[in-house]
């Protein structure tokens, strides 16, 4: 391999080309009339999706420079996906527009730093203007409307998500999984709990695409102690390994030799295992482990006071669950198989009694948090269909709608269909740059905030975007939007065309920040195959699809 440094016009041209390719592929999915994208797989049938992030991740250019640029953009999109689970398409459209405008300005000889200062100044004004337009989401109908919009107008998905929120509360745990039946969508409420602790090592991951640990019917081992040596829990590991089922370890910590041994065992294809830290601290950790034990039906939480030794613990003494899902930040236990409603009800009554007698506001608050986790349960949205392709496409839409709903409940909603960003134009009129190039940066953002609504209207098959923008900007009602479903103007909140503020805000913020990175990017160092590498790879010629290996 040899290193090549790419600079100047060659670099700018590559950036423009990669951004255009990504925006063309991702942008076509925007809006209720957006199109789907087929992603080919090495094995099996192609995946059909409208998930912008999934489309972006699947694009892998051949040229090393294009790969480097695409990776920078995809990493930014992944931040948007991690923070709100939605908004990747909007982020892509905005990024493409800003970079396109900046490239023109640079070609005309404008000062990059001044442009950047103008863009960042305009960014703050746009974010402030978005906050002034927000409305809180209160009713079940509004929740259903937000979910419906994010699910590309599928009212069934919107209604089911609203049902889940009603059953487990706005802060409750809602998960999505594939159904084995043919029903489009069904809701199942079950016992369960989620807490804010993720896997202790990414090597535990079983779903590499989503960076998740997913276990079906696992055993759960609970301990208040630190696990430094695998020898201390070896009897439990051996018993579970013989059963052929996965194991989740919840402990104060798992570190050193114990963690490395568990990881090595997993990588070698042995026991399916994952370890997470127990939630809380001190006495609160002890109480929360007790709550998890009740949910999972575990007989013991191992500690120094327990008379039973680890080697005496049988499989019947461990907790169980139907499903466990672990991300880098959270652990969700769904549907304990063995726990019964009586033990959970008894635990809930005990916590309620503690709340009544507690004189500390802080203690009461923490007890109420525990009560909510125990009593809320988990709502499971089961997605079905007549084919694997259909199920996966629908599941993507359900997950996007669920993320959008959570964001809407958290920060409120703004007018949808790209109207909220369009209405921030008024806030930019009063901002003046220190010089012509800084003003150019402000004007670039003015053009960028019009890009999402233009793309949504274009995807509907209409060429009326300029007329729509002109009409919306001439009137004073910031709740008026253009509904591409009906091709008419309507009130955003009455018609249900709303976007979560958090999604719009983060998508815009990340898009501008990403564009700012490319603005000051002067060189990219890439590895390119040397002649010797090419000759060596060619020795295996004739092996179609092997990529030279």
From Swiss-Prot:
It is an enzyme of class 5 (isomerase). One of its GO terms (molecular function) is ATP-dependent protein folding chaperone. One of its GO terms (cellular component) is cytoplasm. The keyword ATP-binding applies. PROSITE patterns: CHAPERONINS_CPN60. SUPFAM superfamilies: GroEL apical domain-like (SSF52029), GroEL equatorial domain-like (SSF48592), GroEL-intermediate domain like (SSF54849). It catalyses: ATP + H2O + a folded polypeptide = ADP + phosphate + an unfolded polypeptide. Its EC number is 5.6.1.7. One of its GO terms (biological process) is protein refolding. ATP binds at residues 29-32, 50, 86-90, 417, 499. Keywords: ATP-binding, Chaperone, Cytoplasm, Isomerase, Nucleotide-binding. It comes from the Bacteria. It is found in: Cytoplasm. PANTHER family: 60 KDA HEAT SHOCK PROTEIN, MITOCHONDRIAL. Forms a cylinder of 14 subunits composed of two heptameric rings stacked back-to-back. Interacts with the co-chaperonin GroES. Belongs to the chaperonin (HSP60) family. Together with its co-chaperonin GroES, plays an essential role in assisting protein folding. The GroEL-GroES system forms a nano-cage that allows encapsulation of the non-native substrate proteins and provides a physical environment optimized to promote and accelerate protein folding. This is Chaperonin GroEL.
């Amino acid at each position: 391999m040899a290193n090549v440094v790419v600079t100047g016009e060659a670099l700018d041209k590559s950036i423009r080309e990669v951004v255009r390719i990504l925006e063309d592929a991702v942008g076509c999915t925007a809006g209720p009339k957006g199109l789907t994208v087929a992603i080919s797989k090495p094995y099996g049938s192609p995946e059909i999706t409208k998930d912008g992030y999934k489309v972006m991740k699947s694009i892998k250019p051949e040229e090393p420079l294009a790969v480097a640029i695409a990776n920078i953009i995809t990493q930014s999109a992944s931040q948007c996906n991690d923070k709100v689970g939605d908004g990747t398409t909007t982020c892509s459209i905005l990024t493409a527009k800003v970079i396109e405008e900046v490239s023109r300005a640079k070609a005309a000889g404008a000062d990059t730093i001044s442009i950047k200062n103008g863009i960042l100044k305009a960014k703050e004004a746009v974010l402030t203007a978005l906050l002034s337009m927000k409305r809180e989401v209160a009713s079940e109908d509004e929740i259903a409307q937000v979910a419906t919009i994010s699910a590309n107008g599928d009212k069934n998905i919107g209604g089911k998500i609203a049902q889940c929120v009603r059953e487990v509360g706005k802060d409750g745990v809602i998960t999505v999984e594939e159904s084995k039946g043919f029903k489009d969508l069904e809701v199942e409420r079950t016992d369960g709990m989620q807490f804010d602790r993720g896997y202790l090592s990414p090597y535990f991951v079983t779903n590499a695409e989503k960076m998740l640990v997913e276990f079906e019917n696992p055993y759960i081992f609970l301990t208040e102690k630190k696990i430094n040596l695998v020898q201390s829990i070896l009897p439990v590991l051996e018993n579970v390994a013989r059963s052929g089922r996965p194991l989740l370890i919840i402990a104060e910590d798992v570190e050193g030799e114990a963690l490395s041994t568990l990881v090595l065992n997993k990588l070698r294809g042995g026991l399916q295992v994952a370890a997470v830290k127990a939630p809380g601290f001190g006495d609160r950790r002890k109480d929360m482990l007790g709550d998890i034990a009740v949910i999972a039906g575990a007989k013991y939480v191992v500690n120094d006071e327990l008379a039973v030794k680890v080697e005496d613990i049988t499989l019947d003494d461990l907790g169980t669950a139907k499903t466990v899902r672990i991300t880098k930040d959270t652990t969700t236990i769904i549907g304990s198989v063995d726990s019964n409603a009586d033990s959970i009800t008894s635990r809930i009554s005990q916590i309620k009694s503690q709340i009544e007698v507690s004189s500390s506001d802080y203690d009461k608050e923490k007890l109420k948090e525990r009560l909510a986790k125990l009593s809320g349960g988990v709502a499971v949205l089961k997605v079905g269909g007549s084919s694997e392709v259909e199920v996966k496409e629908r599941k993507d839409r359900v997950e996007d709608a669920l993320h959008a709903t959570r964001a809407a409940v958290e920060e409120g909603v703004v007018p949808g269909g790209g109207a909220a960003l369009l209405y921030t134009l008024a806030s930019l009129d009063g901002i003046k740059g220190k010089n012509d190039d800084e003003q150019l940066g402000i004007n670039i953002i003015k053009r960028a905030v019009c890009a999402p609504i233009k793309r949504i209207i274009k995807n509907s098959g209409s060429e009326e975007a300029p007329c729509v923008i002109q009409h919306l900007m001439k009137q004073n009602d910031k709740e008026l939007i253009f509904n591409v479903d009906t091709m008419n103007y309507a009130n955003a909140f009455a018609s249900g065309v709303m976007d979560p503020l958090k999604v719009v805000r983060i998508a815009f913020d990340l898009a501008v920040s990403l564009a700012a990175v490319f603005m000051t990017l002067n060189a990219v160092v890439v590895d390119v195959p040397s002649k010797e590498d090419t000759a060596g790879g060619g020795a295996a010629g004739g092996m179609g699809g092997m990529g030279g290996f």
